[in-house]
């Protein structure tokens, strides 16, 4: 199987490259990519100086869509073309890094440990995203904000398993996407609030507390 590389500034568009296979425990193909928001929706673009990229989007109690109830989303991109983010508080299991590397045909010797796998959102659930702390820099690493980055090079997987990768990381399957102006409309309707992101919340493995911690940060900001 192969790997997709797709990192672009501003609105992100997937450029077809190699596609990456993943171990059966994930039951999906892992494709590390940054994507645009879903088509459709309102037509009012986000102001250039109001980007939420690198921040956390937190569902309010008014949001009753079961796909997003009490979700915390790390925003990857947000501009006039739409918005895209990853749900970070819906873990679905773990995957052995060595098994994943074997699926990729990569050398798994000297590799140990697991990656925490999350439900990243309802859009394109066959795509995967590696989110990690920004002290690691590979060939295709892109720092999004809040000390958080994404890397499209599969070498990040081996680095994580060999102990030379980022301090903290997670794997998300699928993403949340918004058309131009759609997210702004949902925020005005009181369905979301945004707060500053940091690794303590993003990579907190106590998913039951992430939403509460993020909402508490909103109170502090106010």
Predicted features along the sequence, with ranges:
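N-terminal secretory signal peptides that target proteins for export/translocation
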Residues: 1-16
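A short aromatic-anchored loop/beta-hairpin motif
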Residues: 2, 21, 33-222
């Amino acid at each position: 199987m192969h790997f997709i590389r797709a990192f672009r500034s501003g609105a992100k568009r997937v450029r077809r490259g190699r596609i990456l296979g993943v171990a059966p425990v994930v039951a999906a193909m892992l494709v590390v990519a940054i994507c645009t928001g879903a088509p459709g929706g309102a037509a009012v673009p986000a102001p250039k100086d109001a980007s939420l990229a690198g921040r956390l989007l937190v569902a309010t109690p008014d949001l009753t869509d079961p796909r997003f109830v009490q979700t915390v989303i790390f925003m990857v991109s947000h501009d006039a073309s739409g918005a895209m983010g990853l749900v970070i508080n819906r873990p679905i299991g773990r995957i052995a890094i060595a098994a994943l590397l074997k699926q990729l045909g990569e050398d798994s010797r000297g590799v140990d440990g697991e990656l925490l796998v999350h439900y990243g959102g309802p859009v394109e659930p066959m795509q995967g995203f590696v989110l990690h702390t920004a002290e690691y820099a590979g060939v295709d690493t892109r720092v999004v904000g809040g000390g958080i980055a994404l890397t499209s090079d599969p070498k990040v997987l081996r680095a994580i398993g060999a102990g030379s990768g980022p301090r903290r990381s997670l794997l998300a399957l699928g993403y949340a996407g918004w058309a131009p102006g759609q997210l702004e409309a949902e925020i005005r309707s009181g369905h979301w609030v945004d707060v500053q992101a940091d690794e303590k919340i993003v990579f907190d493995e106590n998913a039951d507390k992430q939403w509460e911690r993020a909402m508490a940060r909103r109170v502090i900001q106010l």
